[in-house]
């Protein structure tokens, strides 16, 4: 009886051990299952290693290959922070705007439209290297008025404003033109030249400065910011841009003359500096037509037009005609200190002509233009 009981126990134990062994081999966590999982993981690791190796080989191959450069419409021209490339080329006039919605709107197109939202400037490529055949950043003398009580010439290089011979009349000092301002202007011209030497050009306002409430803007179809003295225009221009990469100035004689030469070299306006004929600009004797050939200002009339309603050259409007424009060119101590440029709707003076007025004049046909120089 005892033998039979022991046999039963032995059989039960063997059965239990057999079940455990089978479970170890065939169960969910059994040896076969684990071996299968290990094989799958090994295959996955090998496949991942092969993929990564192929990627590395491709990257190495790409790095050794000579890349095909993508055409860049800005052609190395630096766009300052807060501005965006709109359109144009180095020869037709690269246009930038401070509104991101204008970005690339006329990409790779020579002529840029006026349907933009931001303040706009045009790149003038030039150099200070006088051994170069490229456009020089320099002054050019075309027509010059000679008049006034002292029969003075309306021309003076800004870099001579700190010469010992320079004096200031009571009218000058009463209207903010003095030795300190002259020092500022000399420093401005030197900074402009340094910027051009470093970056190969500068930006000029696409339009005459307009007035939106009391804000100075450089946009299409704005009332020109006029009826202000030279000193007010000088101060406003310096505040148009507050930027870590660019400084705004009242246009200098260097910037003005270089822009006129750029237009003559790169557009149909070959004699823009010395003539008013055939340019659809707002001069007294000329009629002005809109793009649909409708006359918006008859010939023989004096009428201020909003910015950008005439014909552009190199994507720049009204360098000749509309407002007479203040620059940093001054001739202190003479009967008429302030030099004006660009003709005007009361006159028939061409874009390159220089004439002058008193430092206290603030007329509706006297405006100004801003420039941007990269830091």
Enumerate the predicted regions with their spans.
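Disulfide-stabilized, aromatic/cysteine-rich ligand-recognition loop
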Residues: 227-235, 241, 247, 251, ...
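C-terminal juxtamembrane segment of a hydrophobic transmembrane alpha-helix
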Residues: 14-36
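Membrane-proximal N-terminal amphipathic helix
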Residues: 30-63
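Short, small-residue-biased leader/transition segments that mark boundaries at the very start
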Residues: 1-2
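GGW-centered surface loops in extracellular recognition modules
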Residues: 67-133, 248
């Amino acid at each position: 009886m005892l033998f039979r009981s022991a046999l039963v126990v032995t059989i039960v134990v063997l059965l239990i051990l057999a079940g455990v062994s089978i479970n170890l081999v065939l169960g969910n966590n059994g040896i076969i299952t684990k071996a299968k999982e290990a094989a799958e993981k090994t295959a996955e690791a090998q496949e991942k290693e092969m993929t990564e190796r192929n990627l590395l080989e491709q990257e190495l191959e790409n790095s050794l290959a000579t890349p095909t450069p993508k055409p860049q419409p800005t052609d190395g021209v630096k766009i300052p922070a807060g501005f965006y490339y709109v359109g144009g080329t180095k020869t037709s006039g690269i246009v930038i705007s401070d509104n991101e919605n204008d970005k690339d709107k006329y990409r790779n197109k020579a002529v840029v439209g006026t349907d933009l939202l931001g303040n706009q400037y045009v790149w003038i490529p030039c150099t200070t290297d006088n051994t170069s055949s490229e456009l020089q950043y320099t002054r050019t003398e075309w027509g010059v008025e000679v008049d006034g009580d002292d029969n003075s010439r309306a021309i003076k290089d800004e870099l001579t404003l700190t010469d010992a011979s320079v004096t200031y009349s009571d009218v000058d000092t009463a209207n903010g033109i003095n030795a300190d301002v002259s020092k500022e202007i000399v420093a401005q011209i030197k900074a402009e030249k340094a910027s051009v030497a470093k970056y190969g050009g500068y930006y000029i306002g696409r339009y005459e400065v307009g007035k939106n409430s009391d804000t100075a803007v450089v946009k299409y179809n704005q009332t020109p910011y006029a009826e202000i003295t030279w000193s007010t225009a000088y101060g406003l221009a310096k505040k148009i841009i507050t930027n870590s990469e660019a400084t705004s100035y009242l246009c200098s004689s260097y910037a003005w003359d270089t822009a006129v030469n750029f237009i003559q070299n790169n557009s149909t306006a070959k004699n823009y500096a010395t003539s008013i004929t055939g340019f659809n600009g707002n001069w007294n004797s000329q009629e002005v037509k809109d793009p649909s050939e409708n006359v918006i200002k008859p010939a023989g009339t004096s009428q201020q037009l909003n910015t950008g309603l005439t014909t552009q050259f190199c994507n720049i409007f009204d360098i000749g005609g509309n407002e007479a424009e203040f620059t940093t060119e001054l001739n202190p101590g003479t009967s008429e200190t302030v030099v004006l440029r660009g003709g005007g709707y009361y006159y028939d003076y061409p874009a390159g002509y220089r004439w002058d007025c008193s430092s206290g004049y603030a007329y509706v046909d006297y405006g100004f233009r801003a420039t941007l120089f990269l830091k």
